[in-house]
Amino acid sequence: MKNWRTLILGLALSASTAFAAPQVVDKVAAVVDNSVVLESDVNSLLQSVKLNAQQAGQQLPDDATLRHQITDRLIMDNIILQMAQKMGIQVTDEQLDQAITNIAAQNRMSIDQLKSQLANEGLNYNTYRSQIRKEMLISEVRNNEVRRRVTVLPQEVDTLAKQIANQTGENDELNLSHILLPLPENPTQQQVDEAENLATSLVKQISEGADFGKLAITYSSDSQALKGGQMGWGKLQEIPTLFAERLTQVQKGQVVGPIRSGVGFHILKVNDIRGGNKSVSVTETHARHILIKPSVVMTDSQAQAKLADVAQQIKNGSTDFAAQAKLLSQDPGSANQGGDLGWASPDMYDPAFRDALLKLKKGEISQPIHSSFGWHLIQLLDTRQVDKTDAAQKEQAYRMIFNRKFAEEAQTWMQEQRAAAYVKVINGATN
């Protein structure tokens, strides 16, 4: 559930040279197709993971195990970044600036405050930008490649929407952590037995009080391994079906597994459970307006003044809104109806029109308002609350099914890319 838009300060998990310490002659840690992972990359991420683990109070495995996990992570990132280069995928400076602005805002900081925070943690801002760019590229490639493998059928959406409608007060959102013990394609029985025995051993250790996060960092091949396996919050229906079937009656703190899938053995921990609000209503407005568009015969200021005069006449009672709309309005869709726009969600209107409309009281007429269409005089006739639960449930059902299928396919896709790449770790291991 990682998203580059919500990266916490001080950690870019794919960081390379995040710490601006002087470097000796660099070494190659791994060869990955036509590129390499440098020893400095591994060391930098090692420091970053240790720093964040210390701040979070997270236990870590020994350095050798942690270094192995970090090397695997950087190899996978390298494979995907090479794919981005071959596909011609780029992140513009504007996109990068917006992403970093979002990160700062989500941390309730300005850009200057973000820079200061990074400096306090020993991070160079330009290096930080480079790492966020890499995160964006990796996300873009993964999303593009996996999305095309996911199909959501209308009947699936309808079925799940009905299930959501029938749920009342159930705790249907879970905060999970995850350990994946992978299996190769076409594993031997010995490989299956070894992975299953390890999974069973880990479950026993966890039940006896071992730290789940430390075991995830040590053993897991999931993309969230270096975060202690934390997947974050997700609806039950968003979780892969194989997991969801085992999570319907769980309690907070419960450990589930081992679960066998096509990619390996899984262990889950339920960190927390919460319910969701099932009822969805929106405010609709009933409004009418008069639109005058500036032209060669009527300047912008003249159009504004004309509507101000009309507003005063309506308030004085010398004319009425509908009559003036039929006479003056240049909106062909509503002029003949006295400017009546009917019932609608305010969000469908031009932002300037919407904002002015939402400030009006029932029966009140606005001052002349300028939008991208011209000058408007707006009157709010009424408001109402409309139950949009059915539409919201279908939208929620689609999103849940898509997210669940995406998560299932993403892990398979990543294993396929890893298996197809030439990788040589310089300590002698070759894949």
Curated annotation (Swiss-Prot):
It comes from the Bacteria. Residues 1-20 form the signal peptide. Its EC number is 5.2.1.8. PROSITE patterns: PPIC_PPIASE_1 (PS01096), PPIC_PPIASE_2 (PS50198). Keywords: Chaperone, Isomerase, Periplasm, Repeat, Rotamase, Signal. GO terms for cellular component: outer membrane-bounded periplasmic space. InterPro entries: OMP_Chaperone_SurA, PPIase_dom_sf, PPIase_PpiC, PPIase_PpiC_CS, PPIase_SurA, SurA_N, Trigger_fact/SurA_dom_sf. Chaperone involved in the correct folding and assembly of outer membrane proteins. Recognizes specific patterns of aromatic residues and the orientation of their side chains, which are found more frequently in integral outer membrane proteins. May act in both early periplasmic and late outer membrane-associated steps of protein maturation. The PPIase activity resides only in the second parvulin domain. The N-terminal region and the C-terminal tail are necessary and sufficient for the chaperone activity of SurA. The PPIase activity is dispensable for SurA to function as a chaperone. The N-terminal region and the C-terminal tail are also required for porin recognition. This is Chaperone SurA. It comes from Pectobacterium atrosepticum (strain SCRI 1043 / ATCC BAA-672) (Erwinia carotovora subsp. atroseptica). The lineage of its organism: Bacteria, Pseudomonadati, Pseudomonadota, Gammaproteobacteria, Enterobacterales.
